[in-house]
Amino acid sequence: MTALAYYQIHLIYTLPILGLLGLLTSPILTKFDIYKISILVFIAFSATTPWDSWIIRNGAWTYPSAESGQGVFGTFLDVPYEEYAFFVIQTVITGLVYVLATRHLLPSLALPKTRSSALSLALKALIPLPIIYLFTAHPSPSPDPLVTDHYFYMRALSLLITPPTMLLAALSGEYAFDWKSGRAKSTIAAIMIPTVYLIWVDYVAVGQDSWSINDEKIVGWRLGGVLPIEEAMFFLLTNLMIVLGLSACDHTQALYLLHGRTIYGNKKMPSSFPLITPPVLSLFFSSRPYSSQPKRDLELAVKLLEEKSRSFFVASAGFPSEVRERLVGLYAFCRVTDDLIDSPEVSSNPHATIDMVSDFLTLLFGPPLHPSQPDKILSSPLLPPSHPSRPTGMYPLPPPPSLSPAELVQFLTERVPVQYHFAFRLLAKLQGLIPRYPLDELLRGYTTDLIFPLSTEAVQARKTPIETTADLLDYGLCVAGSVAELLVYVSWASAPSQVPATIEEREAVLVASREMGTALQLVNIARDIKGDATEGRFYLPLSFFGLRDESKLAIPTDWTEPRPQDFDKLLSLSPSSTLPSSNASESFRFEWKTYSLPLVAYAEDLAKHSYKGIDRLPTEVQAGMRAACASYLLIGREIKVVWKGDVGERRTVAGWRRVRKVLSVVMSGWEGQ
């Protein structure tokens, strides 16, 4: 078998895997990922070059001469050009594996509860110095590279690895190996996967004589009788150092995300590359303890969404960390306010609760704004016209009112149940990043919900707040389109350079997001027709049953004759109905699919219509938006394909199917629905 030259090792073994990892990570790779990997490449290149030059001059390893036909292209400081390429390739491979292994994690959840003192950190970093001394003080009879020194490679390795690794471990080791948040497993995977692969590549290369390790400079233990143990240790320890360096970057980002308001006060926070901001660096190296409350708030939000909004939480892994943590806080606020207003056991006066939330919005954002250019307000052809008081696509947002921590604490203490304080604090962190109007729309949707469950009089009169398709779509705009619009503003805050320049362009993106949010709400309504009816909630338009004239906007259906008897069947499920309950009788035949499928079809039309606008979002959030939409629309597909027998039971999607769908959409882009 012909021996391989060094460059051929790259062509066959390292560059293909690098290309594959680049392909896999390209939809989710962020500027911050590129930034931190680039930092590590620079450090690896700068630190390893003099070290490698030194061990080559001391005869630790050699490469074939040009005359052998396996020679290298050339050298600089005695180091082959191909070796310089290896410095870069290994760091990037490990960095991309780290991105894949940690993308599903929220950086802030791994922050330690307490900070070590500066003296403690310094002592931890100095611990390895005596160990290094023991290795480097080992007697060597001569500096001549031909002289036997079996500990040379191991000593050299300890000199290269130990100081930076111990410093990084002292600063961010506890963060990188946090078991509670799951980061430790991802850290170990990010170290071991590239390590095992590169050890195998080295095994092949040494066996092929692509390069040679001097037997006189190693202890003599070989893996498989071929690869010196020092080579395996090199890959393990350098990958440990790389991953700890990447973890330190994420550590600073976590401090920025959780404690940015403490650092910057009411000033606008920078949106990218938090490592280079002196205030964040000062907090990273500071021995001052920081509040554990922001982390606890985020933990409670994650727990809430894992229990009540699993589809969103799984899909949110497609967003960059900065956007994702803000969206988790925003979505948790929406869930909490829904519970506050909608649950009698939580709030005995839901209208007063709506007033309380509105007052909180005034505290954060000031009074409602009115459109500066009403003629610029756009509407979707598939949705009702936007409310005339809706502001146009404002950017940048006007400065928010000044809000001191004491004012926030006072409001929460006096007016919000203590178990929900976390969600209000998380929304307060978005002050200045999102507008008020979509949240006012959300409250308008809650007001519609308060009409349910229907009174006995309303049941007898066949009267609901959702009379026509336009009413249904307006409700969807309020409770879901508004949240999607807020998502756009959160994404713009993370990438201000990618915000469309004109009002018309911004409005097009916002309208597309409202279409998508409404589409997802229609899927939820289609899924929950029976469950909602048993709670006295009726979101199907009365016009579906021929009980009202349809609006100009009409969801196409398969029937032409009025079907008021079907609405009566639904009413019989309501707790306030005086009609005989027929749910368990032989005569109860409600064709659930007949009414759910038109909603799903219209939702898919809305989603498709929104794709062009959604694709104009900042590049880094597009994968997350696709994932969120696909996760919800999968429920619609479940209704169409899997729902058998018109039983009307609530459909859920298996977790593994949801994850598979999210991954496929993130990697491939929009798919035909």
From Swiss-Prot:
Chief subcellular location equals: membrane
Give the stretches traversing the membrane. 9-29, 36-56, 81-101, 117-137, 157-177, 187-207, 226-246
Keywords per UniProt: Carotenoid biosynthesis, Isomerase, Membrane, Multifunctional enzyme, Transferase, Transmembrane, Transmembrane helix
Region annotated Lycopene beta-cyclase sits at 1-251
User: What does the entry say induces or represses the expression of this protein?
Assistant: Down-regulated in stationary phase.
Naming one, the record's GO cellular component terms include: membrane
Biological process GO terms, please? carotene biosynthetic process; carotenoid biosynthetic process
Q: What are the start and end residues of every segment in region (Phytoene synthase)?
A: 258-673
Q: Give the membrane topology, semicolon-separated if more than one.
A: Multi-pass membrane protein
Tell me where in or outside the cell this protein is found. Membrane
One short Pfam family name for this protein? SQS_PSY
Q: In which pathway does it act?
A: Carotenoid biosynthesis; beta-carotene biosynthesis; Carotenoid biosynthesis; phytoene biosynthesis; all-trans-phytoene from geranylgeranyl diphosphate: step 1/1
Catalytically driven reaction(s): all-trans-lycopene = gamma-carotene; gamma-carotene = all-trans-beta-carotene; 2 (2E,6E,10E)-geranylgeranyl diphosphate = 15-cis-phytoene + 2 diphosphate
> Which InterPro entries does the UniProt record give?
Isoprenoid_synthase_dom_sf, Lycopene_cyclase_dom, Squ/phyt_synthse, Squalene/phytoene_synthase_CS, Trans_IPPS_HH
The record's GO molecular-function terms, alphabetically, read: 15-cis-phytoene synthase activity; intramolecular lyase activity; lycopene beta cyclase activity; squalene synthase [NAD(P)H] activity
EC number, as in UniProt? 5.5.1.19, 2.5.1.32
Q: Where is this region: Disordered?
A: 376-399
Q: What does this protein do?
A: Bifunctional enzyme that catalyzes the reactions from geranylgeranyl diphosphate to phytoene (phytoene synthase) and lycopene to beta-carotene via the intermediate gamma-carotene (lycopene cyclase). The cyclase preferentially catalyzes the symmetric cyclization of both ends of the substrate to produce dicyclic carotenoids. Beta-carotene is further processed to the acidic carotenoid astaxanthin.
Family indicated by similarity = In the N-terminal section; belongs to the lycopene beta-cyclase family. In the C-terminal section; belongs to the phytoene/squalene synthase family.
- This protein is called Bifunctional lycopene cyclase/phytoene synthase
Source organism (scientific name): Phaffia rhodozyma
